[in-house]
Amino acid sequence: MAYSFTEKKRIRKSFAKRATVHQVPFLLATQIESYTQFLQADTPPARRKTEGLQAAFNAIFPISSHNGLARMEFVSYHLSNPPFDVKECQQRGLTFHSALRAKVRLIINDRENPGKVKEVKEQEVYMGEIPLMTSTGSFVINGTERVIVSQLHRSPGVFFEHDKGKTHSSGKLLFSARIIPYRGSWLDFEFDPKDILYFRVDRRRKMPVTILLKSIGLTPEQILAHFFVFDNFTLQSEGAQLEFVPERLRGEVARFDIADKNGRVVVEKDKRINAKHIRDLDSAGTKLISVPEDYLLGRVLAKNIIDPDTGEVIANANDELTEALLENLREAGVKQIQTLYTNDLDQGPYMSQTLRVDETADQTAARIAIYRMMRPGEPPTEEAVEALFQRLFYSEESYDLSRVGRMKVNSRLGRPSGEGAMVLQDEDILETIKILVNLRNGKGEVDDIDHLGNRRVRCVGELAENQFRAGLSRVERAVKERLGQAETENLMPHDLINSKPISSAIREFFGSSQLSQFMDQTNPLSEITHKRRVSALGPGGLTRERAGFEVRDVHPTHYGRVCPIETPEGPNIGLINSLALYARLNEYGFLETPYRKVVDSKLTDEVDYLSAIEEGKYVVAQANATVDADGNLTDELVSAREGSERETRMVTPDRVQYIDVAPSQIVSAAASLVPFLEHDDANRALMGANMQRQAVPCLRPDKPLVGTGIERTVAVDSGTAVQAMRGGVVDYVDAMRIVIRVNDDEAVAGEVGVDIYNLIKYTRSNQNTNINQRPMVKVGDHVARGDVIADGASTDLGELALGQNMLVAFMPWNGYNFEDSILISERVVAEDRYTSIHIEELSVVARDTKLGPEEITRDISNLAEAQLARLDESGITYIGAEVEAGDVLVGKVTPKGETQLTPEEKLLRAIFGEKASDVKDTSLRVPSGMSGIVIDVQVFTREGVTRDKRAQSIIDDELKRYRLDLNDQLRIVEGDAFQRLERLLVDKTVNGGPKKLAKGAKITKEYLADIDKYHWFDIRPADEELAAQLEAVKEAIEQKRHEFDLAFEEKRKKLTQGDELPPGVIKMVKVYLAVKRRLQPGDKMAGRHGNKGVVSKIVPIEDMPYMADGTPADIVLNPLGVPSRMNVGQILETHLGWAARGLGQRIGDMLKAQAKAQELRTLLSQIYNESGKPEDLDSLSDAEVLELANNLKKGVPFATPVFDGAHEDEIRRMLDLAYPDDVAREKGLTASKQQVTLFDGRTGEAFERPVTLGVMHMLKLHHLVDDKMHARSTGPYSLVTQQPLGGKAQFGGQRFGEMEVWALEAYGASYVLQEMLTVKSDDVNGRTKVYENIVKGEHSIDAGMPESFNVLVKEIRSLGIDIDLDRY
């Protein structure tokens, strides 16, 4: 097995028992692929598929004028290069976008001869700006990173369901069907409690379904023929003969004696007809049964009956037979009649009853009825009626089932899936009603709407396409109106197309849609999880209030597609989910998961992706099935899922068709990072998965000693760790950049063979956490494509590292860890283990006001010298300044309005020309409760305003950095070129050259070294071909120089042009403060198993419980937090972490003793290769083994994959290996080595029983006490109630609520209560009076009338009740 550059630095020992045949796919693929398909930017126009932008253009164009003489056709579109890159957009507050231009053709026909083309105009038209996706799957909108969350919505198609007996008091099941298109009107069919079938369009008034059937051209006879089978009767003078159909009589009670053709009675009256009776009648060759007259009465006619002589209609289809009607039929000589066959069991008379309720006569009347329902009050003209009916379901402009919808309709109605129009067809409506009637008759099953075969994912590309199409259709309307003038006014395409509607639709979607969210950027995991989220909320989705339990619940089809664990707690539970690790979307937007094919009980290497619908056809075994070395299933019975319900049952191996690809395939990325997940209760696992997303990146990231093996995948896929784009040799490294000279075989001809990686340094994330990248390569290192070359936030050697490994003891400690509180050693704080850096952005703008422009300046009166010392001559603080609350960061003065001056002031002004009072100080100051170091300043100046020195120096620094990059590229390009030249020139004969090189002389290496490299081009080789090569190299270098000069000039132009600022803003300054947050009491911490708590006390290191060898614990947790929470995973993690720490110490001791590489190999082999997944240590050189050992000193990292992790005996084995008996005795370990005798740090006495001690990976969460702590004496008040505002952001007070009032009442603290409800709250006069009294030194309260009482009086008056206050 080949290890990558970073993997071999620290190999994670894996306990996985099963080899993976299928690698975890790229975690951001769903988002990136969806948007790539939407744009198709890199695909030539001729080869673009009909999807995304192309589909939207194709759907709207061509646009024809109302008179048909002019039309506009779409040719192609292209996206220009973005004007600014991602970083520049973030700094300037711009959107990272590309301009969309479409080539359109305007065709104008001749007025006299409409068939003849008069003129054709083709032009490229600007169609607005389309935001581009960054390489990590996010969007930069107005300078902030946002994510478009995928939406899980009900798929278009036809669905059948019932109300579960909730509608009617009897509990009767009322069946309904719904045809949902992608775009257009919904069509519902529903039974009412009287079993009459109705339909409704777009949830409007319901109407009998036969109206709809008549409107599509069916007569009552045809309707009955579609839904019923007929009984054939031959009328006789008395009674009739019924055509014998055996299955129709079975189960009925005979209403008369039934005889065979010989007259023998087979079934007596009032007896139930059973199978034997049917057989007897059948064997006797019975074809007809004589029935009495009353058997005919009440039966329903299937067809119109017409008098053969007169042609008059005697009876209509759906009429009931009565004695009078039978008499008329006999008189008219009618012999044969057909009636509807119905029964109470499986052939109800529903359509017949519905026809009776329906009062419309024919197709026209039916369509008019539909028109009146859709457009009440409008007169139904023939054209209007026809147009509306066509537009409802048959017009491609207003109705679209989409490919998915057509596929779902066809598969549900039992047709070949891919065929059919995208609009509704008559057969679709008829078949749907038939299936619904069959359901009511007890045949077939209703659909499960929570099945993932009936819910699909709308990804970024599709959501953006819908918005673009909406904008384009607004453009279409405007173009249609103006096309008529195109000929007369000689207009060009750009005169007709206004791109504003498109831009505004796109801007609205990306800026303010419910699915466009501010990216959660706390750490790499939260970033990746946000992009893999699927939400059932949003436009066209569910709402929190209406979503019931079933929608939120875990469904069997979620297996391998949606994570059953990771979902928010609270009102959104179950509505917002995360994609499972291996899930992907198919072409229809349904979620698929991979399964490994099994043939004849043997696993193959073939992997198939199955959607929820396809999976229902197969028997799928679980990944933990026992498999031998050859891949055969060995158990007699295997646990597998089968049937549409996906119930788990035991099956024989020969029935298994597929098996899971990995045990972790059912969970999401966040849940798969929890080791021993299988031992945690589901609720706590949910909290653990969610809290990892809130972990704040620490100053020094520390990889988890106990991981799951997925850490590297998450770190790399999130984009926070830098990967090498191409293999090569590291040429230059510093903290800011890495330069790699690309391998010859990977370099593309004509391109620069240099990759430069500018690292992100101390940059603010959306959540104000710090993003910082650190190089992990040295000059001369060989790296391959995809190797991690720099660590980012929360990554350690290319692995995700959200927290720190802490030595944890489970024991109570003086009540300080009561109720999940956490006790922490002072050492943890002193070593900065949980110190994090947070970056705050503070900005100030100078505007043009009515009284004159605001000015950013150092010249501010009444400002202390100490404050001014921090500002440069432009009035802006310098980088590196340490500032505290209230310090000035940017000096700014605002013109003040002219005020009435006193005579004295006028005199002073006349004498001294005192002007200082004309301006007021509006400088940017550090907010209260904040202190830090200024790490960056950015100045933006409007076009036309001269830059100050500070702004100019920032631009100069940026250009210097860019020039450095270009110089490095040029240096390497030239270096490669001159090396190649040297190989070409050495030992070649010349005609002459610099330094008097004689004709016929041979070139030597020494000669070339002696002259300047640029003089090599002056050498005149004798070989003409060589001379041509020499010239070609010279031209190539000059070409590159020219390109770099152009690039530099472009960059300079970009930086020196004025910035786009909001209207009225002259200058904007942004100051970035780095705030260091140490761990302190009140901060929230958590493990990965949902074990969360608040730091209660930081204890001096000498008072912490310690081991026999003097090692103190870092954290003391309460053991009572484990049993009731049922998250035993944390105990197993602690034991395995303890083993990892011990093994690291053993390796460290060996390195101290300068052990040979072979000894190290022996120990490493015992650790890595005696259980779990073996590692190829022999492929490492001795130097690499030594580097590996050095990186393992702090602990050997373990991987225990979810559902395939370490077993108890493996943990014991590792503990025995880590702590041989002599070491165990020295440390005071018990025989199991899982517990240890601890001593009280304060008394030195041993605790009375052994304590579980080990290493746990603990996280500091983004709920820091510094952000929550807040105090107020006086501050802002609410305008109406005059009560203090609430919350830290408003500088509010503490609410004294109803229950608190009760408490003071209970204690009888009347004066405290009066003070609380009046002068401390909303008694305006009382508040000022108290202040006056305090100033005077009088400590008394004069409580007045609370403002809230006045508000109450006003509210009562608003009801028209005159209420007044009698003051005595």
Swiss-Prot record:
Transmembrane segments: none annotated. Gene3D superfamilies: 2.40.50.100, 2.40.50.150, 3.90.1100.10, 6.10.140.1670, DNA-directed RNA polymerase, beta subunit, external 1 domain, DNA-directed RNA polymerase, subunit 2, domain 6, RNA polymerase alpha subunit dimerisation domain, RNA polymerase Rpb2, domain 2. GO terms for biological process: DNA-templated transcription. InterPro entries: DNA-dir_RNA_pol_bsu_ext_1_sf (IPR042107), DNA-dir_RNA_pol_bsu_external_1 (IPR019462), DNA-dir_RNA_pol_su2 (IPR015712), DNA-dir_RNAP_su2_dom (IPR007120), DNA-dir_RNAP_su2_hyb_sf (IPR037033), RNA_pol_bsu_bac (IPR010243), RNA_pol_bsu_CS (IPR007121), RNA_pol_bsu_protrusion (IPR007644). Its EC number is 2.7.7.6. PROSITE patterns: RNA_POL_BETA. DNA-dependent RNA polymerase catalyzes the transcription of DNA into RNA using the four ribonucleoside triphosphates as substrates. This is DNA-directed RNA polymerase subunit beta. It comes from Cupriavidus taiwanensis (strain DSM 17343 / BCRC 17206 / CCUG 44338 / CIP 107171 / LMG 19424 / R1) (Ralstonia taiwanensis (strain LMG 19424)). The lineage of its organism: Bacteria, Pseudomonadati, Pseudomonadota, Betaproteobacteria, Burkholderiales. The gene is rpoB.
